């Protein structure tokens, strides 16, 4: 009898809560205007059922095929718009860019990025402009990217030594590439490799997997109950406390240390100095500095390592492309002992391989934006605070823009002059407009330089007798489009004299 009463009370609670949500939705003022078309929606959940069991970029690509390049999807309470064409993306990222320049906030970003005091997820504001300007001038300028060359060479040499010692055995390249990228970024930005390097990489991956804005509580932001019951929230706070401990140690170390690896200021020293400057427009808090550090790890490590791993995976699946890329690298660099950014500029085919990889596997498949004010895109009204998702993954596989879009074919870039610098809006893996990735050149150097070394110094085969056709090329869920499974490869040292 007591069990029956308990179930009855639970059912009454769920029904009452559902009715209250429906009433709130009915009472909510409806935006006015000509809105984008979209599929029929269900009460309460809208179009959430379309995402179940699928990666969001895949599900939303199907919506665009039926309803057009500017499509409306109702994700619970959140009015959302999917952009899947060059023209719509150009309007949102260039013509009405200021109106669409906010980021969509999620529970994950608010908790892990210190209430979005960072650069990636910060609203478009004076704080964002100030922090981005400091980041670009002190860390990510072309001059600085070149000055970090000896760090890249040192860390890549460390990786090559490890691979030579493991010759003939399967190596977890996912782990090795993530460690390499993280070490380069730590030394360039913070002056040294941190002790908790591996743990922080793991925390970054978990944070990004939970920051995509597809948690149930993100879809019903007005629901205090869902916000309270969000099971991921407690996990996020546990992660945040551990991240905070690691970042606090980095901050404390810089408070008592006057110089980094270069014998001068690193970016954290600059932020501390500017924190004391009474002339800056927006005060820099300690949380802002921590959020910036976490930004550097998450944006720098995850996107660069993701792209490098996808390149290696595609090369293993396409042996003819691998042979052509290795032949180019070995012919161009055989007389050089060390090389960096300027040297890889002559590797035209390898650079096309990287481009083709980012076309098929963009580091951020769905670029998140949010409206700061009502605007019009392709003739459709996008209301204030609407969530905008630019489906970079879908545009990269659209036959309107790409011949044989499902084929890995780097030679296509011999025939077209498309680049990813934010000018060709069907190909924006780094974004475009005001919020284009500020670390584009830094990230690209951290992909191309190690990749050239790996192709030059080793021949590669798949582990455990696998064939290219056996490879699992699935993507994991999350904000970044990482390989679902770790990439295991067997290196064999290359002898130039042979």
Swiss-Prot record:
InterPro entries, per the entry: CYP450_71D (IPR052306), Cyt_P450 (IPR001128), Cyt_P450_CS (IPR017972), Cyt_P450_E_grp-I (IPR002401), Cyt_P450_sf (IPR036396)
Sorted UniProt keywords: Endoplasmic reticulum, Heme, Iron, Membrane, Metal-binding, Monooxygenase, Oxidoreductase, Signal-anchor, Transmembrane, Transmembrane helix
TM region(s), chain numbering: 3-23
Protein name: Cytochrome P450 71D15
Subcellular location: Endoplasmic reticulum membrane
Cofactor: heme
Entry keyword annotation includes Cell inner membrane: no
A GO CC annotation given for this chain: endoplasmic reticulum membrane
Catalytic activity: (4S)-limonene + reduced [NADPH--hemoprotein reductase] + O2 = (1S,6R)-isopiperitenol + oxidized [NADPH--hemoprotein reductase] + H2O + H(+)
């Amino acid at each position: 009898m007591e069990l029956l009463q308990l179930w009855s009370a639970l059912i009454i609670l769920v029904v009452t809560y559902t009715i209250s949500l429906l009433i709130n939705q009915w009472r909510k003022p409806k935006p006015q205007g000509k809105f984008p078309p979209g599929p029929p929606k269900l009460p309460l959940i809208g179009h959430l059922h379309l995402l179940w069991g699928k990666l969001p970029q895949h599900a939303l690509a199907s919506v665009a095929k039926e309803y057009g390049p500017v499509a409306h999807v109702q994700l619970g309470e959140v009015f959302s718009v999917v952009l899947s064409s060059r023209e719509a993306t150009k309007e949102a990222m260039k013509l009405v860019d200021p109106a669409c320049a906010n980021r969509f906030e999620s529970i994950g970003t608010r908790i892990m990025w210190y209430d979005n005091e960072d650069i990636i997820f910060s609203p478009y504001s004076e704080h964002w402009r100030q922090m981005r300007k400091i980041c670009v001038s002190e860390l990510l300028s072309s001059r600085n990217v070149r000055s970090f060359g000896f760090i890249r060479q040192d860390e890549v040499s460390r990786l090559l030594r490890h691979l030579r010692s493991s010759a003939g055995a399967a190596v977890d390249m996912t782990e090795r590439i993530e460690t390499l990228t993280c070490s380069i970024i730590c030394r360039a930005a913070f002056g040294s490799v941190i002790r908790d390097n591996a743990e922080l990489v793991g925390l970054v991956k978990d944070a990004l997997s939970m920051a995509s804005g597809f948690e149930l509580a993100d879809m019903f932001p007005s629901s205090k109950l869902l916000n309270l019951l969000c099971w991921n929230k407690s996990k996020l706070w546990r992660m945040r406390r551990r991240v905070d401990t690691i970042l606090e140690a980095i901050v404390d170390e810089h408070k008592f240390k006057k110089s980094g690896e270069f014998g001068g200021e690193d970016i954290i020293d600059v932020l501390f100095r500017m924190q004391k400057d009474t002339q800056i427009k927006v005060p820099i808090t300690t949380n802002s500095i921590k959020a910036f550090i976490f930004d550097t790890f998450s944006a720098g490590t995850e996107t660069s390592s993701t792209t490098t791993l996808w390149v290696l995976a595609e090369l293993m699946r396409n042996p003819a492309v691998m042979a052509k890329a290795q032949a180019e690298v070995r012919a161009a660099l055989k007389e050089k002992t060390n090389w960096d950014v300027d040297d890889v500029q002559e590797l035209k085919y390898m650079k096309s391989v990287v481009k083709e990889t980012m076309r098929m596997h963009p580091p951020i498949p769905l670029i998140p934006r949010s409206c700061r004010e009502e605007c019009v895109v392709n003739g459709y009204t996008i209301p204030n605070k609407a969530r905008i998702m630019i489906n970079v993954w879908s545009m990269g596989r659209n036959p309107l823009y790409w011949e044989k879009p499902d084929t890995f074919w780097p030679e296509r870039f011999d025939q077209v002059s498309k680049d990813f610098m934010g000018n060709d809006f069907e190909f924006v893996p780094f974004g475009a407009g005001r919020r284009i990735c500020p670390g584009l050149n830094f990230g690209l150097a951290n992909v191309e330089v190690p990749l050239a070394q790996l192709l030059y110094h080793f021949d590669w085969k798949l582990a455990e007798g696998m064939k290219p056709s056996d490879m699992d090329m699935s993507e994991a869920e999350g904000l970044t489009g990482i390989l679902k499974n770790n990439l295991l490869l067997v290196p064999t040292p290359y002898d130039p004299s042979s």
